[in-house]
């Protein structure tokens, strides 16, 4: 049946090589036949060619890959599909019964949507013959084993009957391009066949001409060995084998008249002619079956010996009897013929076959097989992998059985048989074919994996089939022609391998050199450089002087051609390292008509395309000189492009990336004292410009009366934000401030009244002895005209004896603060009078009071709800809890407590005014160009946690950090299109590092505005003019981190205040070199980039991304892995991934920060790290797919077929452009883990209350999966002109935003298991990681958990250190919560 896209887990190791790229370039220019040794990578050249063709051809055209056998079709399809996962591919072979597809609609359905078809030659030839497929549908035809394209072969039929006539009639545009692949360009010994193959395929034969030495380096020619044996006497079987002799005797004496077919013909007079013919020829079905069976038995005897022949006869007779009993297996056989064959063979005496003999002499073998055993015994058994070619299928099965049971081989070799996939249903043999086709399905995979180490096969394994490199290949019979010799020898391509041919001692044509000489003669017809090898070696010994010199513009640094190679290799060595990528420069050469050479060098794909490829300027006689000159020109280009400094060294970790010299900045710095705004006010009071703001105090959101006051200052009063003051659990006060207004012509006496009133309020709520100084900085007064203040003061200043107040019958609701002078004037709140009459003439008056609140910081909610008394006297309380004081010892303030309570709020108001003055000053000076709308965000940004204010900078710093990283990343990306990702990353790190930001804070004077003083509410005293005048500023210690944090917090505050534009202005204030507004984001990124190559892309998948690219080359770049070296016009995705990383941070952090539930900075950081975790992004990348309809053909009856429909997923990762089997193997391994863990991870993301740390650590996806997400984000950002909105759409499309919302809305626990363990443990817990080497050369990881120097347990066998640590942490959580019944973190 047809195979569709699949993976080949054990594809042969492969690394990109120069000669493969050379062959690719040649195939793009003309039709060629790639002639290279077996194992040198021809199929991978074809894969590159297919990829290139699909990028440029019309999407309705097909690439058709042709192979001579079904097995080879299946193998090549696996290679193509696994290396081009984005391409829909399929096979069409006889296994699909294509010969029965007689309807055009069937063919249309089969080909619909597929871009690559792999089939045998006959399938395409027949389809073309019947018009089901037209030559115009084909973009590229690839002929594997192209030497078959001769004479009447179906390959030649395709060319002669369809290609050439179409070419003649309509021209080259009407026919597909041609590529042939072969390791043996001639089949027989006639070298003229090379020209015939070229003509038939309309192609020229090419072998790598410029890198022959590299080709030989990777192609290991085996040691050729002859194995001699004494041939068996053909007539000796009669006496040597009783069973075979009896079989032969019975066959010789077989009476044709007893044949059921003859007897049937004799009974019918109409069949007289057929009867005569049968009697004359002696051919009937039964006689032919027996004849072939006897011949095969004799052949096995001669090849393998008596035991094998008797085994074959015994097994064949048993198989026949089993088939006769099985009506399904016997099919259409004639019952009489079945009975006749069974009866004939039943008379043959058969020996008992013993499979478990320990005596080698019990296995009577032929001299030829004995020679084979001796050879195998002498072979190196370490990592043995062998292949034995035999002539006949029956020999395959018999030899496999014999090797599997013989004492010399059964313990040493794991044998398997292989005869290919020819349609066995077409064979009419019911006797003697012992091979079970189903048992060989896994043979090749078992051999590649090492489960089998010796295959016995027919010539079906000569051509194309991808096998692991063999250490031993044996031809049990001489190769029939040159093609077989070359192909079989090519199987032995392991280093120090052996290719053996068995010869009888009486063979006169056993000279192995005959094949070698003939092969060399054929190859020379198309390989000129082989004949010139000696002269080239002589030329390379010449010493050519390369006179080139480069001097740094501002230094005395010099580069000569002799130094250029070392410098260029060093430049490549310090590029950002990438797995699966060879970072070395690649040199190639071209030759002119004079035989001179010119070099070309290609640098790794992370280097900008403009300087990635450099050609030499002169022609040279030697490769060595050409390389020197080319390396010099390349390094000169790097210098001129700005990637090398004036010292002629790479920029990485050099001063060129530093914007400021920070030296070694200490972690603790001496900085300015906190700015004190009262000093300016102190001087302003000498000639005040009185401003006042009306204050309104409401209790419980306005329920009840208002208290109105005024705040007075000597100069402009900044707007103050409303304040909420928490009296107790049920009572709050809201303090609002009206806009300040100037009050002209306030006499000095009125100012003094204000000072007295301010002192009165401060004293009314204090038990301390107040200072006589009244030169307060901020003044407070009731909401009256200044002319009325004197009268108000006369009314409420002072106190009266309690007895006097009692006697006046004063309104309890207007009672002032009670002061018990027996307790040194301790204040109380009046509750009620208590009067006791001991006698008629004497009454004792007492006061039941409530304790005066000790709390002074009303800005924070109180922690104990019952710790305060209520203000409202109507609230009942138990008298037993209230102190009773004697009226005679008390006085009561004239100022009612309902007014005096304002004195408790003055400290908070003054502190709020102070911080507002600091923020206003900062806004109007350092931040004057930032255009903050409000100082509220500035206040938050400059308040350190140490100040213990209601808000601090931590949340804004979290936001500002990402905004700064985003802005700097954008600026460097757009400003330096010549910089690779390494320079960009280091340049960004230089700018956003704490020392650089701390220096910016010091340079601008920001350090003075950072609030670190803590409000001491209990010891607070109102600031006085006399204290501030003449005060000398001091210094304070501050950490570098705090300085940097405040800069980032101000950036975050600016973003909250006015969006990105305000944030960019703030960044520019502290980092003048960052000016993103000055960068044209729409044109800067592509300003020096050449046009990228085309790249096939699924249109529906592009729609699924949620963004339509104006410049699709950006999407191509976003999908180009650094290993993709075949496209020198497109840079790898590393730059876009660098930018996308910052874009993703910006999108995620904004969503976290702006969520309705405000979280502390620590929680936001944990959420961010969980959401942008590389394994989560990789999982979403693997999941990001569309579903497409896939049509296929199913057989509904014997001759009927129907089109079936199914759905298949097309994932984004399939479109990543790469090269290299290492990356492919890693990709497939990650996808296998994804398939195993998908349900668990997906379920966790949708339902679990915890983040799936454990499952994601086991996923251990390669980084390129998450890189693709970030690089596509970067591409969208660039193409949209720096617009974050379409980036947010893509993040939504991949499912990341949905999971982030779930985390934020439902409080998903994102703590890392290790953090959970540390929180659960009452003592320090240590995780000790260890790398454990494995026998296969790899490594696993283990992690032990230790508590108080005792080891709790060890987790072993983990793929990575992260998995080991997370698994250990999960187990530790179980251990620590084993008695609680549930764990705080599931293993999800």
Swiss-Prot record:
GO terms for cellular component: cytoplasm; nucleus. SMART domains: DEXDc (SM00487), HELICc (SM00490), RIBOc (SM00535). ATP binds at residues 36-43. Residues 23-203 form the Helicase ATP-binding domain. Residues 906-1059, 1098-1281 form the RNase III domain. Keywords: Antiviral defense, Antiviral protein, ATP-binding, Helicase, Hydrolase, Magnesium, Manganese, Metal-binding, Nucleotide-binding, Repeat, RNA-binding. Residues 564-658 form the Dicer dsRNA-binding fold domain. CDD domains: DEXHc_dicer, RIBOc, SF2_C_dicer. Its cofactor is Mg(2+); Mn(2+). Pfam families: DEAD, Dicer_dimer, Helicase_C, Ribonuclease_3. GO terms for molecular function: ATP binding; helicase activity; metal ion binding; ribonuclease III activity; RNA binding. Mg(2+) binds at residues 1137, 1267, 1270. It comes from the Eukaryota. A motif (DEAH box) lies at residues 144-147. GO terms for biological process: defense response to virus; regulation of defense response to virus; siRNA processing. The record marks 1263 as: Important for activity. InterPro entries: DEAD/DEAH_box_helicase_dom, Dicer_dimer_sf, Dicer_dimerisation_dom, Helicase_ATP-bd, Helicase_C-like, P-loop_NTPase, RNase_III_dom, RNase_III_sf. Residues 368-537 form the Helicase C-terminal domain. Its EC number is 3.1.26.-, 3.6.4.-. Dicer-like endonuclease involved in cleaving double-stranded RNA in the RNA interference (RNAi) pathway. Produces 21 to 25 bp dsRNAs (siRNAs) which target the selective destruction of homologous RNAs leading to sequence-specific suppression of gene expression, called post-transcriptional gene silencing (PTGS). Part of a broad host defense response against viral infection and transposons. Belongs to the helicase family. Dicer subfamily. This is Dicer-like protein 2. It comes from Aspergillus fumigatus (strain ATCC MYA-4609 / CBS 101355 / FGSC A1100 / Af293) (Neosartorya fumigata). The gene is dcl2.
């Amino acid at each position: 049946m047809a195979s569709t896209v699949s993976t080949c887990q054990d594809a042969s190791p492969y690394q990109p090589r120069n000669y493969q790229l050379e062959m690719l370039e040649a195939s793009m220019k003309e039709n060629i036949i790639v002639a290279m040794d077996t194992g040198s990578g021809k199929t991978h050249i074809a894969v590159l060619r297919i990829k290139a063709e699909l990028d440029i051809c019309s999407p309705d055209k097909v690439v058709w890959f042709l192979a001579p056998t079904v097995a080879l079709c299946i193998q090549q399809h696996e290679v193509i599909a696994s290396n081009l996962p984005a391409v829909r591919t399929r096979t069409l072979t006889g296994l699909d019964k294509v010969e029965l597809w007689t309807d055009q609609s069937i063919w249309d359905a089969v080909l619909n949507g597929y871009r690559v078809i792999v089939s045998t030659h006959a399938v395409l030839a027949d389809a073309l013959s019947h018009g089901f497929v037209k030559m115009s549908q084909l973009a590229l035809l690839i002929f594997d084993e192209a030497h078959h394209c001769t004479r009447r072969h179906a390959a030649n039929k395709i060319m002669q009957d369809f290609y050439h006539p179409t070419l003649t009639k309509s021209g080259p545009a009407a026919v597909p391009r041609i590529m042939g692949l072969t390791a043996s360009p001639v089949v027989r010994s006639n070298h003229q066949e090379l020209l015939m193959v070229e003509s038939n395929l309309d192609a020229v034969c090419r072998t790598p001409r410029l890198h022959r030495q590299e080709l030989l380096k990777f192609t290991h020619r085996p040691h050729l060995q002859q194995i001699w044996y004494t041939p068996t006497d053909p007539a000796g079987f009669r006496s040597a084998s009783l069973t075979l002799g009896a079989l032969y005797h019975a066959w010789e004496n077989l009476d044709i008249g007893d044949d059921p077919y003859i007897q049937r013909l004799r009974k019918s007079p109409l069949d007289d002619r057929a009867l005569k013919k049968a009697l004359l020829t002696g051919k009937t079905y039964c006689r032919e079956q027996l004849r072939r069976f006897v011949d095969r038995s004799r052949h096995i005897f001669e090849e393998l010996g008596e035991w094998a022949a008797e085994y074959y006869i015994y097994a064949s007779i048993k198989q026949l009897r089993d088939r006769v009993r099985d009506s399904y297996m016997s099919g259409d056989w004639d019952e009489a013929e079945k009975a006749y064959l069974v009866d004939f063979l039943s008379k043959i005496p058969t020996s008992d076959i013993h499979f478990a003999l320990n005596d080698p002499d019990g296995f009577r073998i032929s001299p030829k097989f004995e020679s084979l055993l001796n050879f195998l015994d002498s072979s190196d058994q370490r990592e043995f992998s062998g292949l034995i070619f035999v002539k006949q299928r029956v020999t395959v099965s018999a030899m496999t059985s014999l090797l599997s049971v013989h004492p010399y081989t059964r313990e040493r070799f794991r044998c398997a048989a292989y005869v290919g996939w020819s349609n066995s249903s077409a064979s009419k043999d019911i006797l003697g074919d012992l091979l079970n086709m189903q048992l060989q399905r896994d043979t090749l995979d078992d051999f590649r994996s090492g489960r089998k180490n010796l295959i016995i096969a027919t010539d079906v394994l000569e051509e194309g089939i991808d096998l692991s490199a063999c250490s031993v290949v044996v031809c049990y019979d001489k190769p029939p022609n040159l093609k077989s010799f070359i192909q079989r020898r090519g199987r032995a391509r392991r280093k120090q391998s052996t290719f053996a041919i068995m010869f009888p001692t009486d063979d006169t044509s056993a000279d192995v050199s005959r094949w070698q000489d003939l092969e060399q003669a054929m190859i020379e017809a198309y390989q000129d450089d082989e004949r010139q090898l000696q002269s080239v070696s002589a030329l390379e010994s010449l010493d050519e002087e390369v006179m080139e010199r480069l001097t740094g513009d501002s230094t005395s640094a010099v580069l000569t051609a002799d130094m250029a190679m070392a410098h260029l290799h060093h430049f490549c060595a310090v590029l950002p390292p990438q797995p699966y990528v060879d970072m070395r420069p690649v040199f190639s050469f071209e030759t002119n008509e004079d035989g001179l050479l010119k070099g070309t060098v290609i640098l790794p794909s992370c280097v900008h395309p403009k300087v990635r490829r450099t050609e030499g300027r002169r022609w040279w006689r030697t490769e060595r000189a050409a390389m020197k000159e080319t390396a010099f020109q390349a390094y000169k280009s790097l210098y001129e492009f700005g990637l090398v400094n004036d010292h002629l060294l790479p920029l990485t970790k050099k001063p060129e990336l530093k914007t400021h010299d920070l030296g070694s900045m200490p972690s603790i710095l001496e900085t300015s004292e906190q700015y004190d705004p009262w000093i300016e006010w102190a001087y302003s009071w000498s000639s005040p410009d009185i401003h006042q703001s009306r204050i309104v105090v409401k209790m419980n959101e306005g329920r009840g009366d208002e208290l109105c006051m005024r705040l007075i200052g000597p100069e402009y009063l900044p707007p103050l934000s409303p304040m909420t003051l928490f009296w107790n659990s049920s009572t709050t006060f809201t303090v609002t401030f009206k806009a300040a207004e100037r009050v002209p012509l306030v006499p000095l006496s009125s100012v003094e009244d204000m000072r007295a009133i301010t002192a009165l309020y401060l004293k009314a709520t204090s038990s301390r002895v107040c200072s006589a100084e009244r030169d307060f900085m901020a003044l407070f007064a009731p909401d009256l005209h200044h002319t009325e203040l004197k009268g108000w003061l006369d009314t409420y200043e002072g106190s009266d004896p309690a007895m006097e107040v009692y006697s006046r019958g004063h309104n309890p609701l207007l009672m002032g603060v009670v002061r018990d002078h027996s307790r040194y004037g301790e204040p109380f709140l009046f509750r009620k009078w208590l009067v006791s009459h001991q006698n008629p003439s004497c009454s004792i008056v007492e006061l039941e009071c409530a304790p005066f609140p000790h709390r002074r910081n009303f800005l924070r909610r109180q922690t104990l709800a019952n710790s305060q008394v209520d203000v409202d006297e109507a609230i009942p309380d138990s008298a037993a809890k209230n102190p009773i004081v004697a009226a005679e010892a008390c006085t009561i303030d004239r100022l009612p407590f309902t007014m005096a309570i304002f004195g408790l709020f003055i400290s908070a108001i003054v502190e709020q005014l102070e911080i507002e003055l600091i923020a206003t000053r900062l806004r109007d000076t350092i931040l004057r160009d930032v255009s903050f709308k409000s100082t509220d965000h500035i206040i938050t940004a400059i308040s350190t946690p140490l100040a213990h204010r209601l808000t601090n900078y931590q949340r804004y710093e979290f936001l500002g950090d990402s905004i700064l990283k985003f802005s700097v990343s954008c600026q460097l990306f757009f400003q330096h299109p010549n910089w690779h990702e390494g320079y960009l990353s280091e340049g960004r790190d230089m700018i956003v590092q704490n020392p650089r930001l701390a220096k910016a804070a010091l340079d601008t004077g920001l350090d003075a505005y950072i609030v670190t003083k803590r409000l001491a509410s209990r010891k607070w005293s109102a600031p006085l003019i006399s204290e501030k005048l003449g005060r000398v500023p001091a210094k304070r210690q501050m950490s570098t981190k705090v300085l940097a944090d405040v800069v980032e917090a101000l950036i975050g505050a600016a973003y909250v205040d006015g969006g990105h534009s305000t944030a960019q202005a703030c960044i520019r204030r502290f980092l003048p070199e960052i000016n993103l507004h000055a960068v044209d984001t729409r044109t800067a990124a592509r300003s020096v980039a050449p046009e990228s190559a085309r790249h096939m892309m699924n249109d529906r998948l592009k729609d699924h991304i949620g963004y339509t690219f104006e410049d699709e080359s950006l999407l191509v770049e976003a999908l180009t892995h650094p290993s993709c070296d075949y496209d020198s016009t497109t840079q790898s995705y590393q730059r876009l991934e660098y930018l996308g990383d910052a874009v993703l941070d910006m999108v995620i952090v904004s969503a976290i920060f702006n969520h309705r539930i405000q979280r502390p900075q620590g929680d936001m950081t944990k959420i961010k790290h969980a959401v942008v975790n590389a394994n989560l992004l990789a999982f979403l990348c693997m999941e990001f797919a569309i579903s497409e309809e896939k049509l296929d053909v199913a057989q509904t009856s014997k001759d009927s077929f129907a089109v079936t429909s199914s759905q298949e997923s097309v994932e984004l990762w399939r479109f990543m452009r790469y090269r290299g089997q290492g990356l492919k193997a890693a990709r497939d391994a990650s996808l296998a883990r994804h398939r195993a863990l998908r349900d668990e991870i997906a379920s966790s993301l949708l339902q679990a209350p915890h983040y799936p740390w454990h499952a994601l650590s086991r996923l251990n996806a390669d980084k390129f999966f998450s890189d693709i997400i970030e690089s596509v984000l970067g591409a969208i950002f660039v193409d949209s002109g720096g617009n974050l909105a379409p980036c947010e759409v893509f993040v939504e499309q991949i499912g990341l935003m949905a999971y982030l919302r779930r985390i934020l809305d439902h409080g998903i626990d994102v703590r890392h298991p290790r953090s959970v363990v540390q929180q659960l443990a009452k003592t320090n817990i240590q995780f000790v990681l260890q790398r454990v080497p494995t026998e296969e050369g790899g490594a696993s990881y283990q992690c032990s958990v230790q508590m108080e120097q005792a080891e709790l347990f060890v987790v072993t066998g983990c793929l990575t250190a992260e998995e080991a640590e997370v698994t250990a942490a999960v187990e530790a959580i179980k251990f620590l919560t084993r008695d609680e019944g549930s764990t705080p973190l599931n293993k999800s």
